[in-house]
Amino acid sequence: MSTAELIDDLHPHKPAAAPGGRKKSKPPLALRPLHRMWRKTIDEIQVSALDLPVRGLPEALRGLVACQISDFHVDRDEDLARLASAVEAINQQQPDLIFLTGDYFSGPDTMHRYLGAFRDALKNLRPKSGLFAILGNHDHWSSAERITDALKRAGADVLANDSRRLFIRNEKLMIVGIDDLWSRRAEPSRAFHGVMPDDCTIVLAHNPDTALYAHHLAPGVMLSGHTHGGVVRIPYYGSPIKSILRIGKDYYAGLNRYGNFYIYTNRGLGTFWMRIRINCRPEISRFSLVALAESAHREIPQAKAKRRRRPRHA
């Protein structure tokens, strides 16, 4: 299985200046090439297209299109403009399903400022069969109640240790949403309540480490975010930043197998703490569902040492 194939480069719209606001100063001429490179890694969205192997996928659902975005961190006007561009790009994919996997804001102050505009931007999403969302750690640290309400008003079905049964092309598909791990709200067994052993499931879990506690429930596939792709990506090495995952750095970004199912970790749209990305552009994941070929059992990778409680970057 190859990694994500880049199919499109998208430039976000520039936000309109606020009435009476100051004009943004341009960088010195000598620094403009560096500034353009920095803006490219922060603002130019990459649409990653790939086949997503799903354990137990019915043949009739082969080719179903799903899009995922994560870690919006809408803290500035530029972040809101990037979200608007992402919505437009997702609609161009004509997806059957859209998944939002948490961390919509960084904290309560920016949430209060941008919540209405965030809700209105998401109202423009046009999935054919459903829009589903879960919360991340920053959402619980901001206001889970208010963010959940905004997501619902935008048309999203918000899953918190819950599942939904869909019938698409006359086949059943279960969407399972596990609440955030770092906020100590993840209850995988509760989320899978009512899910039958032979059901095909797409599991949404903000933190890839959730797989450590959910793998025994036999997910069909798991979609996560949280890591921002590692923020800095070095070719043939990955991220040099100290791992915030017990599951390991291999799960920082992209498609990786974990035992008998796959995890896809989206690199996210926004940034937190430091406004930086290096070789790790904002991402929209565009999936075409395929059946995971049955194979011999694979051992579950060993978890690493227990993480510190609340790191500054996530």
Protein language model annotation of sequence segments:
Residues 1-66, 76, 294, 305-314:
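Acidic, histidine-bearing metal-coordination/catalytic regions of metal-dependent phosphoesterases
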Residues 78-167:
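Core catalytic region of metal-dependent phosphoesterases/phosphodiesterases
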Residues 37-41, 69-82, 105-114, 139-143, ...:
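Acidic/histidine-rich helix-loop elements
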Residues 74-77, 106-109, 135-148, 159-168, ...:
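Active-site environment of divalent metal-dependent phosphoester hydrolases
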Residues 67-70, 97-103, 130-137, 159-162, ...:
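Active-site neighborhood of phospho(di)ester-bond hydrolases with catalytic His/Asp-centered motifs
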Residues 153, 208-288, 293-296:
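Conserved beta-sheet core of the metallophosphoesterase superfamily
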Residues 149, 153-156, 162, 168-213, ...:
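Binuclear metal-dependent hydrolase catalytic cores centered on His/Asp/Glu-rich metal-binding motifs
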Residues 54-67, 156-157, 164-176, 197-198, ...:
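Beta-strand-turn-beta hairpins that frame and shape the catalytic cleft
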